[in-house]
Amino acid sequence: MIISATSDYRAAAQRTLPPFLFHYIDGGAYAEYTLRRNVEDLSQVALRQRVLKNMSDLSLETTLFNETLSMPVALAPVGLCGMYARRGEVQAAAAADAKGIPFTLSTVSVCPIEEVAPTLKRPMWFQLYVLRDRGFMRNALERAKAAGCSTLVFTVDMPTPGARYRDAHSGMSGPNAAMRRYWQAVMHPKWAWDVGLNGRPHDLGNISAYLGKPTGLEDYIGWLANNFDPSISWKDLEWIREFWDGPMVIKGILDPEDARDAVRFGADGIVVSNHGGRQLDGVLSSARALPAIADAVKGDIAILADSGIRNGLDVVRMIALGADTVLLGRAYLYALATAGKTGVANLLDLIEKEMKVAMTLTGAKSISEISGDSLVQELGKSLPAALAPMSKGDAA
């Protein structure tokens, strides 16, 4: 199979993975309007072509939280990554490390902090939720710090899980889910051998280190579902500051006032994100939310963005709309499921090449030169959010 784009990896992942796993990462909340809009809105951002600019000394390098990145991209925290390839977090982290960009380990990763961190040359980032069990949160923060994690990504848009209808149809949840997953695995022997049999243990490593070994993955998921905390407030973040003195990034910001609150709190960064369309369907795409947030806090706090990014052009678009760096989620999961570390490394190479083409043809020699001037019109001005059509497309 010829791989030339994220869409090729998506198609390959759909063939490789049991449906319950493919649709878990590919799907979103409710009717998936926001999921689709994440991609569609970003694709409508028109780049401004410039010529005869002598682009021979182009550079993608940037700095974030005193770390040098080879390009303004980091791998986002993705739960159950180790179910998409054997010890998937280790493989994805290795690809990011070799590329010179950060890898973010999810709270609900299969591989624990202690398995992933020692394999890397650069410090990884760690993502954490606010949970009712504050003992677990403190334990996770202490372990992340001991392992040398440099940056905490604090996810705040999940006080309760979103309703993901596709999961009930795919076998991730719903009636007879365990039996359906079993037969799906039987019908996908490559995955069953590589991950199902040889990728064990199939637990949530960061949680099992705290709770001990449960009887099955469902036990972890049940514990986690009962621990999401709808009472979350800025006071919880103040408590976390007692145990974490490194850079803290607040993930899940879609409103300028929340961004201002993050600045007032003293956060080091925010992620403009709708959780990849997996939480509240019908909210703004990240591309639509980003310009107003950048207008409110640009220069006061580092701005990261995710949701809908599929290629290097999308990275340039997000930066032109106001982001300093972007996070890749689904795109790298598709590549990981297809070809492990090699797939993720190849995807990152593709994104780098696409960024270089986009920057060369828009006249931006460095990341700092990508701005609103790189666009024909900003998305919010060229297509008002209230008038944007709802149309079908690939999952975001």
From Swiss-Prot:
**SUPFAM superfamilies (alphabetical):** FMN-linked oxidoreductases
Q: What EC number(s) has UniProt assigned to this enzyme?
A: 1.1.-.-
Localization, per the record, is: Cell inner membrane
Q: Where this protein primarily resides, as one coarse class?
A: membrane
Role this protein plays: Catalyzes the conversion of L-lactate to pyruvate. Is coupled to the respiratory chain.
Where does this protein hold substrate? Y24, Y129, R164, R278
Q: Which residues bind FMN?
A: 106, 127, 155, 251, 306-330
In its keyword annotation, does this UniProt entry include Membrane?
yes
Query: Which CDD domains does this chain map to?
Result: alpha_hydroxyacid_oxid_FMN
Which family would the database say this protein is a member of?
Belongs to the FMN-dependent alpha-hydroxy acid dehydrogenase family.
GO MF annotations for this entry? FMN binding; L-lactate dehydrogenase activity
Protein name (database record) = L-lactate dehydrogenase
Q: How does it sit in the membrane?
A: Peripheral membrane protein
